[in-house]
């Protein structure tokens, strides 16, 4: 009997899906689609990797994807609603947003301190470039239409 117990297969259980938005983001990063991942691909990934009943959880997954797009966590590359292709937004890695904000603040401080004259020169150069691009073309001259000559018709005399 001890042999029968040891010969039983040990099956590994799929982890239960805990958070729909996080699972959706993880599926998008794991799928690594170049133009974003479709809803069908995301559903398939979640169904294979998590212990979820997709017919019951589909509404929650769609809602999580929509809210992820609204909050900026996901980027919607095509279509509308949740029936679209989506890509990973910069919001998932919050460090990226902080770095961008820090760069902007550093640039603003440099402009305030000593580069005020350089900023004015850059603004003047940008205005000159915009004016050069907006050259107005002269209206093309219209060709004169030939005037029809009117000829008098001779009346025929009846004899």
Curated annotation (Swiss-Prot):
GO terms for biological process: chromosome condensation; negative regulation of DNA recombination; nucleosome assembly. Residues 84-93 have a biased composition (Gly residues). It is found in: Nucleus; Chromosome. The keyword DNA-binding applies. SUPFAM superfamilies: Winged helix' DNA-binding domain. Residues 1-31, 80-99, 132-159 are annotated as: Disordered. This is Histone H1.
């Amino acid at each position: 009997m001890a042999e029968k117990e040891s010969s039983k297969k040990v099956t590994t259980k799929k982890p239960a899906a805990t958070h729909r938005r996080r699972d959706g983001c993880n599926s998008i990063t794991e799928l690594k689609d170049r133009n974003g991942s479709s809803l069908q691909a995301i559903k398939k990934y979640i169904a294979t990797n998590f212990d979820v009943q997709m017919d019951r959880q589909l509404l929650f997954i769609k809602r999580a994807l929509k809210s992820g797009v609204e909050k900026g966590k996901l980027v919607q590359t095509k279509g509308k609603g949740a029936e679209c292709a989506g890509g990973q937004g910069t919001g998932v890695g919050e460090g990226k947003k902080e770095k961008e904000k820090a760069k902007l603040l550093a640039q603003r401080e440099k402009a305030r301190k000593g580069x005020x004259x350089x900023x004015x020169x850059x603004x003047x150069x940008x205005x000159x470039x915009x004016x050069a691009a907006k050259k107005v073309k002269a209206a093309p001259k219209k060709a004169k239409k030939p005037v029809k000559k009117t000829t008098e018709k001779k009346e025929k005399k009846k004899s």
